[in-house]
Amino acid sequence: ENKQRGIKEIYEPNETNSQTAEIDLYQLMLGRRSVREWKKDKISDSMIELIVKAGLSAPNSCNRQTNKFIILKDEARIRSVASTVKGGRNFFYKAPHLLIVINDIRRYQFPDEIHTPFQDAAAAIQNMLLMIYRMGLGACWGSYTSNTSLILREKKVKKLLNIPSHYFISGIIAFGKPNMRVCFIPRADISDSIYFEKFK
């Protein structure tokens, strides 16, 4: 029946190892940290493709699958993007790779979907950050997004990268082989962060 519907596989959780997988995933989440210093070494295309596949596997609104990914490896192009973005993202200059997530805004037709492309991109970005860390690499999410205060800068980036006007720039990841050690930063306590039934 699934083949007739064009579905090749259905994901079925494996009960025998689900507990171990859950622990491994949780430790992966706890261990991931933002890295802003990298070696100059480039990452292979096969590793980059695996990172993007992790992004493609993320949930997205109405299964639109609008996330597109532009990978920058050329140093001059990376510097051009970094100089355009500016702000507190000077670490972009040091990155051996930039990964830019864009979304086709024509696929979001209703007024209440104005933030939906950013949500779709954020889910993909988190998946990719975890995959990058799992591969022994380091990354930092630059949180660059399309908004009115950055519209002129965004136009420059779009022109530089040949991005059509009907696409949002939804986020940028800088990544590569880490050249720094990142200390553990305590997170907010669960007792101060969770509320049942209503906010207090």
Annotate each PLM feature:
Residues 1-200:
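Acidic, surface-exposed loops and disordered segments
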